[in-house]
Amino acid sequence: MTLPLTTPGFTDAEHSKRLINKTFTYVVTLLIAIFAAAIISLLIIKNNVNEISDSHDDFLLRKALDTRQESIRSHLKDYAEWGDAYKHLHQNVDMHWAWDKQNLGKSLYDNFGYEGVFVLSPEGATRYSVISGKRIPEDLERWLGQSTKDRLLSELSKKKGVPVSMLTLIDGIPAIVSAEWITTGDDSSVQPLPGRPSVMVFVDKLTAKKLLAIGHDAAIKNVRISPNEVNNQTSLTISTPNGDVHILWDSENPGQALIVYFLPLLILSVLL
């Protein structure tokens, strides 16, 4: 007895068509799954690349701000540890030497952008001030506030007069403030007097223009201040004695380049 080669109720054509449909459905489902997995993987890679890039920018920006503080301390050291400065600024301020001869004058603003230059008496009173390159009588305490000034001088005392610096807010603008005792330095021709030293203070406001320049030097785009905290990858918050500083920048977004380059290739490979 010969058994039928086909399933009862189905012709050979119907059986082949059914098999083709199953195979096609399987292949299409597999391709869709592969495509979806590839898209998800690509998005994950994009986010990871962006996160690494943004973290690197965060590191570079913090480093740039630290370097700027080191720079202002170095400049201050050159002026405060100077025998002539000790002679003309410690007990009494010699205006002719300081301002008329421009030994402590507008060049600090023109060359370094220091908006504030102050000389304080041993008691902490402001004896001399240059504001944005102009000889304007101004009290340091009015600029910084009592608590910030006290903290600065306290830190200076703990460090035995070597240059110190800190970040603060002045009228909502972040600023680096650096202070150092005025000494004779290596000048043996000037004899130090007994008693407490006078203090020299430099103030560097981080204006919008300066922040853009800092970012440009670090290859970071559009560095700026935000009045409010923003919780994203392209922001950092720095605490100061009188408030937090929120700094933002524009991400390089290198992950987007991966999407633009690989996504069309991925779609094309699926279609082909």
Where is each model-derived feature located?
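Juxtamembrane extracytoplasmic/periplasmic/luminal helical "stalk" adjacent to the first N-terminal
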Residues: I20-T23, V27-N92, T234
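Juxtamembrane or sensor-core-proximal signal-transducing alpha helices
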Residues: A37-N48, L258-L272
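Conserved beta-strands of PAS-like sensory domains
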Residues: S129-I131, L140-L144, D171-G215, H246-E252
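Short acidic/glycine-rich beta-turn/loop cap or linker motifs at sensory/regulatory domain boundaries
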Residues: L120-T126
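Membrane-interface helix-start motif
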Residues: H15-I20, L212-G215, H246-S269
